[in-house]
């Protein structure tokens, strides 16, 4: 497994691969890797000839400095997971490598996909995501890029951003990986106590119940949202950030539940913010 720390090192290696007509897959991460990330590596291995993983905690996407300071880091463990996952190259840059002149005063947006959800509750977050992704894509020049659908809005944004700017990369969304009890895997889960982990299971239960209500024939999104909210409100430890029932393709509100549907939630348990979602399709009548 190759470890690169500069864009120049990556460029040399990727050029070699592409000269051999190899397809390059890319999984951008912020480290503290878990089985969810490993599943992205497997998807990449199934699609591309070479797998590149970046590990970089991007300061530009944190609207809360304390959240950035507390983000867990385990580089040695991450490298072991990458090696066992048959990753070909790991990009381990420093902040000064990605932003040699500091974080630039530039705003990258896809406005029609940034009117709700995390774009509203975490102002500046996705601008920072799009900034770092544009730089990483420029360095790696991947043919494919893999994103977990747990961060569903991020996946849609990056896909649309690449389409708008004509990045020659296919953005592929991968299904959320969960614990045996249903909790969506996240690096932030490590900051939860055992009691808080039990409480956090209400997030996936609420979303699953919402999905079941829709599949049972309920057409009113307000009714479904209220049912899910009752589940989350049953715990005094859960503080709701948002809970939405939206069109899964446009992130617009729905008046009637049909077509591609997204159920999305963000909550705080203590100081830890967790997100989760479910998508489903209901045929139009």
Curated annotation (Swiss-Prot):
Gene3D superfamilies: HUPs (3.40.50.620), Pantoate-beta-alanine ligase, C-terminal domain (3.30.1300.10)
Keywords: ATP-binding, Cytoplasm, Ligase, Nucleotide-binding, Pantothenate biosynthesis
Domain of life, per lineage: Bacteria
InterPro entries tied to this protein: Cyt_trans-like, Pantoate_ligase, Pantoate_ligase_C, Rossmann-like_a/b/a_fold
Compartments reported by the entry: Cytoplasm
Record: residues binding beta-alanine: 61
Enzyme superclass (EC): ligase
GO terms assigned for molecular function: ATP binding; pantoate-beta-alanine ligase activity
Binding site for ATP: 30-37, 148-151, 177, 185-188
Assigned EC number: 6.3.2.1
Pfam families recorded: Pantoate_ligase
Catalyzed reaction equations: (R)-pantoate + beta-alanine + ATP = (R)-pantothenate + AMP + diphosphate + H(+)
Record GO biological process: pantothenate biosynthetic process
Residues annotated for (R)-pantoate binding in this entry: 61, 154
Pathway(s) of this molecule: Cofactor biosynthesis; (R)-pantothenate biosynthesis; (R)-pantothenate from (R)-pantoate and beta-alanine: step 1/1
Gene Ontology cellular-component terms listed: cytosol
Catalytic residues of the enzyme: 37 (proton donor)
Family membership noted in the UniProt record: Belongs to the pantothenate synthetase family.
HAMAP family assigned to the protein according to its UniProt record, in alphabetical order: PanC
Extra remark: The reaction proceeds by a bi uni uni bi ping pong mechanism.
Function, in words: Catalyzes the condensation of pantoate with beta-alanine in an ATP-dependent reaction via a pantoyl-adenylate intermediate.
Subunit structure and binding partners: Homodimer.
Protein name, entry field: Pantothenate synthetase
Native source species: Leptospira borgpetersenii serovar Hardjo-bovis (strain JB197)
Taxonomic lineage: Bacteria, Pseudomonadati, Spirochaetota, Spirochaetia, Leptospirales
């Amino acid at each position: 497994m190759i470890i690169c720390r500069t864009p120049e090192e990556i460029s040399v290696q990727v050029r070699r691969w592409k000269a051999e007509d190899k397809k390059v897959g890319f999984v951008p991460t912020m480290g503290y890797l878990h089985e969810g990330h490993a599943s992205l590596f497997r998807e990449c291995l199934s699609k591309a000839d070479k797998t590149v993983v970046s590990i970089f905690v991007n300061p530009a996407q944190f609207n809360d400095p304390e959240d950035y300071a507390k983000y867990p880091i385990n580089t040695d463990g991450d490298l072991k997971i990458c090696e066992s996952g048959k990753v070909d190259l790991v990009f381990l840059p420093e902040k000064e490598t990605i932003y040699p002149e500091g974080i630039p005063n530039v705003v990258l947006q896809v406005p029609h996909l940034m009117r709700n959800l995390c774009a509203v509750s975490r102002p500046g977050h996705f601008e920072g995501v799009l900034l770092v992704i544009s730089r990483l894509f420029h360095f790696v020049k991947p043919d494919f890029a893999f994103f977990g659908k747990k961060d569903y809005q991020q996946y849609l944004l990056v896909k649309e951003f690449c389409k708008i700017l004509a990045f020659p990369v296919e953005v592929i969304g991968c299904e959320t990986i969960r614990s045996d009890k249903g909790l969506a895997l996240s690096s932030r889960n490590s900051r939860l106590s055992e009691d808080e982990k039990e409480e956090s299971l209400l997030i996936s239960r609420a979303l699953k119940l919402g999905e079941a209500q829709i599949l049972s024939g309920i057409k009113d999104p307000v009714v479904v949202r209220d049912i899910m909210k009752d589940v989350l409100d049953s715990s005094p430890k859960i503080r709701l950030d948002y809970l939405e029932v939206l069109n899964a393709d446009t992130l617009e509100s729905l008046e009637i539940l049909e077509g591609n549907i997204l159920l999305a939630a963000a909550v705080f348990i203590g100081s830890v913010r967790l997100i989760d979602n479910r998508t489903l399709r209901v045929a139009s009548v």
